[in-house]
């Protein structure tokens, strides 16, 4: 089983408007509400490709109940309830623009933080791969992901960690290492305090720095240029075909789903990289975030090339 972790989920609300009028009433005829958060995007994609997946994280209030009701029926809900209400994230789509209003979300108490650690530990026996995605809610220390990764490692589970900023830096500087991370160029630049380009020789040098020691897989998305990856001491360049991009949001989460799935199936290097990239591309071809059309899987998969560099 693959266990996904979303510590700060949301209800994503979309308001399409022809024009956003300031300081007056705006009426919306169509409203879209979906269970949101990076980890839940991963969860949806894993369910759509037929993997055995369960979802955990923190939920609360009426929004938490809505989130549970809107999970794919193939997903086992193993969430931990908190006193605060799961947040709303509002996107106003207007005049080919997108204005977002994001709630900070609930503040987690010490008892809730400790309670989730015990809950998480109880799930390790039935998991093989743990996929941790997104930001930490208020109240949790920046080192919280270190504790989750350590619990999973002690249980012998593989861990895919997709976060950024201080939370990622804390894990990388600790003695506890995830199996795989998926930083982009911007996140690499932030971690190292200098600009990192898409040049392959530079990426090879960057991923060989001591900060990344002990991590089995590092996969860097290069957008339309594919991806660059390091598996232990072997480097790969992934080339992808050109596609019609409809909505790129969630493609990184779909890539994480591919990494997690491939690890759970003990795939070889080339198969892992192709699966990760094809799912990211399939998401980009869909209007809905965290969704793939599996009918197009084989066609795109066969057009992806992976070479050792």
From Swiss-Prot:
Q: Which family does it belong to?
A: Belongs to the carbohydrate kinase PfkB family. LacC subfamily.
Indicate the enzyme's highest-level EC class.
transferase
**UniProt xrefs under PROSITE patterns:** PFKB_KINASES_1, PFKB_KINASES_2
The protein's annotated catalytic reaction(s) are: D-tagatofuranose 6-phosphate + ATP = D-tagatofuranose 1,6-bisphosphate + ADP + H(+)
Answer whether the UniProt record assigns the keyword Nucleotide-binding to this protein: yes
Q: Which NCBIfam families match?
A: 1-PFK (TIGR03168), lacC (TIGR01231), PRK13508.1 (NF010033)
- GO molecular function ontology, one term from the record: phosphofructokinase activity
Q: Output this protein's name.
A: Tagatose-6-phosphate kinase
User: Carries keyword Nucleotide-binding?
Assistant: yes
Gene Ontology cellular component terms for the protein in this record: cytosol
Which GO annotations describe the biological process of this protein?
D-tagatose 6-phosphate catabolic process; lactose catabolic process via tagatose-6-phosphate
Per UniProt, the keywords (alphabetical) are:
ATP-binding, Kinase, Lactose metabolism, Nucleotide-binding, Transferase
EC number of the protein: 2.7.1.144
SUPFAM superfamilies assigned: Ribokinase-like
Q: In which pathway does it act?
A: Carbohydrate metabolism; D-tagatose 6-phosphate degradation; D-glyceraldehyde 3-phosphate and glycerone phosphate from D-tagatose 6-phosphate: step 1/2
Q: Which domain of life is it from?
A: Bacteria
